[in-house]
Amino acid sequence: MNCQIRKRCGSCQYIDIDYSQQLIKKKQYCQQLFPKLHVHSVEGMENPYAYRNKVIVAFNQKYEYGLYEESSHHIVPMQKCLLHDEQTHQVLSKIQSLFKRYHMSIYDEQKKRGFLKHVLIRRAVETNQTLVVLVGTDSLFKGSKNFCQELVKACPHVQSIVLNINKRQTSIVLSQQEKVLYGKGFIVDKLCGLSFKISAQSFYQINHYQCEKLYAKVAELLKAQENQIVLDTYCGIGTIGMSIAKNVKQVIGVERNRDAYKDALNNAKMNHIDNISFYNEDATAFIQKLAQSSQHIDSIIMDPPRAGSTKEFIDAVGILKPQNVVYVSCDPSTQARDLKWFQQIGYQAKDVYLYDMFPHTEHVECVSVLHRKSLEK
C-alpha cells in the first residue's frame, strides 16, 4: 500500500520495505543484540495496517489535520493514515467539518495564542467504543454542547468526549486537568477475556491484536501454578497481572504512575479479581523493600519503559530468588544490557521471542524468561 506522506512524516521508517522483509530485519537486529540466545522469528500480523487504537493529530489554521513532520512541529496534512482504522478517519473527518463550521480557534505555537492544540482518539477494538479528547488551552469551550451532539449523531460509536486543559507551552500533549463534555470520560475494552477502562491518560497497548498474542506468551513462559505468588512490576493498568491472576494464589502489582495505578484498582474491581493488589510506588524502591523484608516471591513479571530496568532492581531480584523472571521489553537494546546484569546474579535466558507491535516502524517487542542457573543443574 502506498503512503502519500511517507517522505515527510517519518513515523514509519520501514513503510517502503516489503512486510516480510521488515520482520527479517527486526530479527537480524535482535540476533546482533543477543548473539548467545535463540532469537525466534518475529510474530507478525496477517494484516499489518489499521492497527493503532490511539491517534494524536494536530490542526493547522486551514483546519487541515495531520502528523508532525519528523524532528519538527510542522504539520503534514493527511486525509488518511494507513495505520488508522476507518472509524478513526470517520471521526476525524467529522471533527474537521465541525471545526470549520464553528470557526474553532486553532492554537498558534509561534504567536502563543489560540484554543485547540491537539485531538486524541482512542478506540476500544472489541467493544467498538471511541473516546475523543480535545486538548485546549482553556476550560471554556463555547458551543461544546452542540459540538458533542453533532459528533455523536454522526459517529454513534463515540461514547465519551473529554476536554483536556493544557496551558503549558511544552511538547507534552496532555495535562492532568480534564473536563468531561459527554459520556463518562472513559471507554471500556476487552482484552484476554477481561474488561479494562481506558481514559485519556491510561497506558494501554496500541496494537490490540498483537497484545493478546504477547500476553499469551507471557502466561506460557511463566508456567504459573495455583499456589504461587507473582510480582507484576511496571504493571501499568494491570493488564498482564490480571490476565494470569486466575492461575495463581496471589498477584502483587506495582506501578509508579498514579493515573495508571488508579485504573488498575478500578479494573480489578470491575473484573471481580480479589487475589490481586496494587501499590503506587517506584518499581525499584518497592522491590528493594520486599527484598529487605524477606518476602516470598515465586515469579516476577517485568515490563519496564524504554529505558529498561535498573541495576538496583535486578540486585533485589537476586535477593528474592524467584524461580523465574519473565521480561517484556519495548527496547531490545536496554533488555540486552539488563540480561547481562541478570547473569551476574545467577539468572540466565535461553530464548528471545519477538512480536511486531508496530508494523512499518523499526520497533519490536521482546519477551524472555530467565531461570536461576542453580535450578537448571
Regions found by a protein language model. Give the residues of each.
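A residue-level signal for conserved active-site and pocket-lining positions in enzyme catalytic cores
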Residues: 12, 55, 119, 161, ...
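N-terminal auxiliary segments of SAM/dcSAM-dependent transferases
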Residues: 105-183
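Short strand->helix junction
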Residues: 19, 137, 141, 203-204, ...
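Short, acidic/hydrophobic/Gly-rich beta-strand patch recurrent on exposed beta strands
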Residues: 66-70, 133-135, 264
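Local cysteine-cluster metal-coordination motifs and their immediate loop/turn environment
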Residues: 2-18, 237
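Extended interfacial segments that mediate partner engagement and assembly in macromolecular machines
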Residues: 13-108, 121, 125-127, 140-141
